[in-house]
Amino acid sequence: MVVFIGREKELAMLNQAYLKGGNSIVVLYGREQIGKTTLVKKFVQDKTYVYYQARELSEKEQNRYFEKVLFSVKEKAEKERIVFVVDEFDLMQKGYKTFFADFLMKFDEFPKGQVMVLFVSSAIGWVENDMVSDMGELAKYMSLPIKLKEFTFVEMVDRFPESTTKDCILIYGILGGVPGYLEYWNPKESVKQNIVRLIVDKKGVLHTEAQRFLKTSLRELPFYLSLIHI
């Protein structure tokens, strides 16, 4: 079971955007394993919503799947205010270069004041450097992006109330404040046992995490991997 800790500020920002009314677009972004999905689930738990997991598809395939979702959005929005979540939305335009321009036309057709679009992304570099220009006219409907960062040490300590201060310092030093990593840590085991099980063991869930993260986050992967092995 995933424990919801921290994120009060970000949750309040999402709720404020929802209560503000009007058709709007909010962008929530942050690295993988940072807790975006957990926050979104918490946010929509008392709201009517439509969820779409974006994939990198051709324009034809993207349209086929997305049109069905848009129909559901319009149908629900005719009756009540809803949240339309598009997870990893940056993937939409990779094989569909006019996605944002086309979505703008669909956005304008939504019932007035009934739809809050929540775009979610793990592509930090793209969101911070290219998103606004790629979105074009659609960007004018967007509020300030919300970036999820790692837990602070104090927030991390709340996750392990029975652990000693020393152990919490070690946990934070090893895993940082990444919620997805912290979920794997077993406070009933020693620090050494956790390290062996999660990282040292070749079958450990975090054994190859450093390379995987670099591969998805950095453009010049071979260069950065060479630094690791120096």
Question: Model-predicted segments: where are they?
Answer:
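Walker A/P-loop nucleotide-binding motif
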Residues: 23-40
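Conserved P-loop NTPase "ATPase switch" module shared by AAA+ and STAND
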Residues: 77-99
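Conserved NTP-binding/hydrolysis module of P-loop NTPases
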Residues: 46-52, 56, 60-75
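Conserved small helical "lid"/interfacial subdomain of P-loop NTPases
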Residues: 143-168
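N-terminal pre-P-loop "Q-motif" helix
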Residues: 3-14
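Sensor-1/coupling segment of RecA-like P-loop NTPase cores
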Residues: 29, 91-99, 103-135
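Conserved small/polar residues in nucleotide/adenosyl-binding loops
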Residues: 228-230
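Amphipathic alpha-helical "lid/sensor" segments that cap RecA-like P-loop NTPase cores
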Residues: 161-213
